[in-house]
Amino acid sequence: ANNSNKEMNMTYLKNLVLLFTILFAFTNAQAESKKFNMVFVPASEKGDESDYTALIKIVEDITKFKINTIKVTDYNAAVEAMRAGRADIAWYGGKTYIKAAEIADAEAFAAGVRPGEKDAGYYAYFVVKKDSKIKKFSDVKGKVLSLNSIGSTSGDLIPQVELAKINLSTTNEDDFKSVFYAGSHDACLLAVLNNKADVCGMSSRNYEARLADNTFKKEQVRIIHKSDRVPPPPLAYSKRIPLEDRIKIKNAVLEAHKYGKIGGYGGEMSHYISVKDSDYDVLRKVVALLKKNKS
């Protein structure tokens, strides 16, 4: 009887071990098979894929998730992709993130810090050619202004806010000879360099990136105005992703710099820091104020 009980116990233990082995293998297979789509809007004419590739590869290696990138051409498309469930993770500008948080269940979780900088914030610059007759910010009245794209934070929203401070508006025909959207920060700057615009409003990140890759030389231009600090363009994920997976993705992004060279929105990054939704309340107030002033 004792031998019979021992055999039964051994059989039970073997079956239990087998069950746990199967469950463990199944759990691992599930984790490895999880796939997420990441959407981004190129910040420049350079394409930007290389800025994201290294970071994504490291995140994939750490989490064992598969991340597929989707490039779209405008900010609204990036929001719509997450709202419709076609994208799970996104690189957004600050203003676009506010919209995505409102209608697409987006949640900001990280932002890149550029090499040599102390935080992830950046600025909107107003740039003119070196020999321009525009000497101070108020001199832009009556001139040709180029901006990035409608919906851009540092290439549309913040320039409008800064102009409002000196009682100018892009929608008032008396304030500018013309205002046009060039389609990217790079194109906005090139419009000035090629005499298509007198002044451009653009991201400080793209200004520095194009200076670094010799698209232009510092002596060709002047910065006539710099905005207050702008909250950084965040990486955001959909709240529809299970919490445990969101935590894995966030932790991997925050640790990524330890595993190799990484990039992000606007070029090379030294590392990523944690951000939260309330960090963008200042932009929400700016958007509300601008709407109020226009109404």
Where on the chain are the PLM-derived regions?
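Periplasmic-binding protein-like
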Residues: 36-41, 110, 115-125, 215-253, ...
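Ligand-binding clefts/hinges and TM-proximal coupling segments of bilobed small-molecule sensing domains
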Residues: 66, 144-162, 251-295
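A ligand-binding cleft/hinge motif common to bilobed small-molecule-binding domains
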Residues: 91-104, 159-165, 191-194, 198-219
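Short helices/loops that flank or line small-molecule/ion binding pockets
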Residues: 76-90, 103, 121-122, 138, ...
